[in-house]
């Protein structure tokens, strides 16, 4: 961000913030859709039955753990690239 004016830095930060929010909302929407499609199949009541509730909890937990692990791996690879080394495991 060197070489940018203060106004340009603020604009860049604002754009990055909007992009991150959009990506978060997309991820959240996909999570809701996937877990709903996989877990909810009884539409005879207005509430979730206990089996569906448990399935959704496991689905969300699994998705969050997978996302966290992927994020860790990306950070590891990014750090290795920044140090000029090769990607881990190569």
From Swiss-Prot:
Keywords: Chaperone, Disulfide bond, Membrane, Metal-binding, Mitochondrion, Mitochondrion inner membrane, Protein transport, Translocation, Transport, Zinc. This is Mitochondrial import inner membrane translocase subunit tim9. A motif (Twin CX3C motif) lies at residues 35-59. Its main location: mitochondrion. One of its GO terms (cellular component) is mitochondrial inner membrane. Heterohexamer; composed of 3 copies of TIM9 and 3 copies of TIM10, named soluble 70 kDa complex. Associates with the TIM22 complex, whose core is composed of TIM22 and TIM54. Interacts with the transmembrane regions of multi-pass transmembrane proteins in transit. The twin CX3C motif contains 4 conserved Cys residues that form 2 disulfide bonds in the mitochondrial intermembrane space. However, during the transit of TIM9 from cytoplasm into mitochondrion, the Cys residues probably coordinate zinc, thereby preventing folding and allowing its transfer across mitochondrial outer membrane. Disulfide bonds join 35-59, 39-55. Mitochondrial intermembrane chaperone that participates in the import and insertion of multi-pass transmembrane proteins into the mitochondrial inner membrane. Also required for the transfer of beta-barrel precursors from the TOM complex to the sorting and assembly machinery (SAM complex) of the outer membrane. Acts as a chaperone-like protein that protects the hydrophobic precursors from aggregation and guide them through the mitochondrial intermembrane space. One of its GO terms (molecular function) is metal ion binding. Gene3D superfamilies: Mitochondrial import inner membrane translocase subunit tim13 like domains. Belongs to the small Tim family. One of its GO terms (biological process) is protein insertion into mitochondrial inner membrane. It is a peripheral membrane protein. The lineage of its organism: Eukaryota, Fungi, Dikarya, Ascomycota, Pezizomycotina. InterPro entries: Mito_inner_translocase_sub, Tim10-like, Tim10-like_dom_sf. The gene is tim9. It is found in: Mitochondrion inner membrane.
């Amino acid at each position: 961000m060197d070489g940018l004016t203060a106004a340009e830095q603020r604009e860049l930060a604002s754009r990055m913030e909007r992009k991150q929010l959009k990506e978060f909302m997309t991820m959240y929407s996909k999570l809701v859709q996937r877990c709903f499609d996989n877990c909810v199949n009884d539409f005879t009541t207005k509430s979730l039955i206990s089996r569906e509730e448990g399935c959704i909890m496991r689905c969300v937990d699994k998705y969050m753990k997978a996302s966290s692990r992927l994020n860790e791996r990306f950070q590891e690879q990014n750090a290795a690239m920044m140090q000029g080394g090769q990607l881990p495991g190569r």
